[in-house]
UniProtKB/Swiss-Prot annotation:
Enzyme Commission code(s) on record: 2.7.2.3
CDD domains for the chain: Phosphoglycerate_kinase (cd00318)
Keyword Cytoplasm (UniProt): yes
Name by which UniProt lists this protein: Phosphoglycerate kinase
GO biological process, one term: glycolytic process
Cell compartment(s), UniProt: Cytoplasm
Gene that specifies this protein: pgk
SUPFAM superfamilies for the chain: Phosphoglycerate kinase
Length: 392
């Protein structure tokens, strides 16, 4: 199913109500990472060039349905003004007569930013009345907030009941690349799934399994799979309640002739602490007193080998305790291998995206997804409310 996009509409003189994802990290009122703001620029610039009056809306943080100036979008308005080279007017609310009046005074090419939509509890409740109030500021609804596409909120899907709805360039790109992974991946297709828990990744593992030729499983969840295979995992993370689930998953992989790569050597520690001394274990088995913290050199060699000939790669989740520098090598090396892969490469999920950015490799990846939970749910095959309302 394809989505309607901004290229399908005439925006001249129209009010484009654009849902962006400006949920950026702030420290003492200053933006520490403006990646999400920059990601919205192509859509905003295009709408301006088409003569639209651009009305932007977003959430920021969790103000719990109350007006809390700590979560005001004012810093975003300032940064947008700098990036666009024009004044972006910040409105003091997102609904109401004053907002409608301010929007009605806009000229073609003007850009305004509404205040945080989550200052109203009705936003997350997907209140019909609140969605209707928001819709009064637009003629066409543009959803460019892939990061919140898995939420059925008033500003992400409710507004589409009142206005024609299309996707912005960011939404279109996410749908195109993640959709390609699920619908028609070119073989050999390698899935690399990391993260700490089987429970949080089993749905994406099961969704990608029938499409994959090779599946790499790393991170804390790998130890539950190794336990199923009969190996010693020491004091490593184990989800006993997922032993049967992991066992039937490995059986299914065998039936489908999918090669599953689990760690064959490890970097371990005596305690789960940032400054624990890393030790190398040249074996699949982990000593009883040790905790698996990262994948070892032999495992990395194996992953490098399958990636060198892959035509499609999806990577979601870290391969070790990436937040501790001593145990980040596995994730860092995999980021490098994915970047050097000649095929289509898609990276989604907070830590894997952070790894790619940390080592300045994002320019070598075909597509770096902007959605954490949204990417995961998309790859699980779930219907995302923010995308469903855009479908043709």
């Amino acid at each position: 199913m394809s989505i309607r996009t901004i290229k399908d509409c005439d925006f001249s003189g129209k009010r484009a109500l654009v849902r962006c994802d400006f949920n950026v990290p702030l420290r003492e009122g200053n933006i520490t990472d403006d990646t999400r703001i920059k990601a919205a620029l192509p859509t905003i610039e295009y709408l301006k060039s088409q003569g639209a009056r651009v009305v932007l809306m977003s959430h920021l943080g969790r103000p719990k349905g109350e007006k809390n100036l700590r979560y005001s979008l004012m810093p975003i308005a300032r940064r947008l003004s700098e990036l666009l080279g024009q004044d972006v007017k910040m409105l003091s609310d997102c609904i109401g007569d004053e907002v409608v009046t301010a929007v009605s005074c806009m000229q073609n090419g003007d850009v305004v930013l509404l205040e945080n939509v989550r200052f109203y509890k009705e936003e997350e409740e997907n209140s019909d009345a609140f969605a209707m109030q928001l819709s009064k500021s637009g003629d066409i609804f543009v959803n460019d907030a892939f990061g919140t596409a898995h939420r059925a909120h008033a500003s992400t899907s409710g507004v589409a009941s009142y206005l024609p709805a299309v996707g912005g360039f960011l939404m279109e790109r996410e749908d195109e690349f993640l959709g390609k992974i699920l619908k028609n991946p070119e073989s050999p297709f390698v899935s690399i799934i990391g993260g700490s828990k089987v429970s949080s990744k089993i749905a994406v593992l099961e969704s990608l399994l029938p499409k994959s030729n090779v599946m790499v499983i790393g991170g804390g969840m790998a130890y539950t799979f190794l336990k199923v295979e009969g190996y010693s995992i020491g004091k490593s993370l184990l989800e006993n309640e997922y032993i049967d689930v992991a066992s039937s998953f490995l059986k299914k992989a065998k039936e489908l002739s999918v090669e599953v790569i689990l760690p064959i050597d490890h970097v371990v520690a005596s305690e789960f602490q940032e400054y624990s001394m890393p030790e190398y274990v040249d074996s699949v088995n982990i000593p009883d007193s040790k905790i698996g913290m990262d994948i070892g050199e032999k495992t990395l060699k194996k992953i490098e080998g399958v990636l060198s000939s892959a035509k499609t790669v999806i990577w979601n989740g870290p391969l070790g305790v990436f937040e501790f520098d001593s145990f980040a090598k596995g994730t860092a090396k995999v980021a490098e291998y994915v970047a050097n892969c000649p095929g289509i490469t898609v990276v989604g999920g907070g830590d894997s995206v952070a790894a790619v950015n940390k080592f300045n490799l994002s320019g070598k990846i075909t597509h770096v997804s902007t959605g954490g939970g949204a990417s995961l749910e998309y790859l699980e095959g779930k219907v995302l409310p923010g995308i469903k309302v855009l479908e043709v």
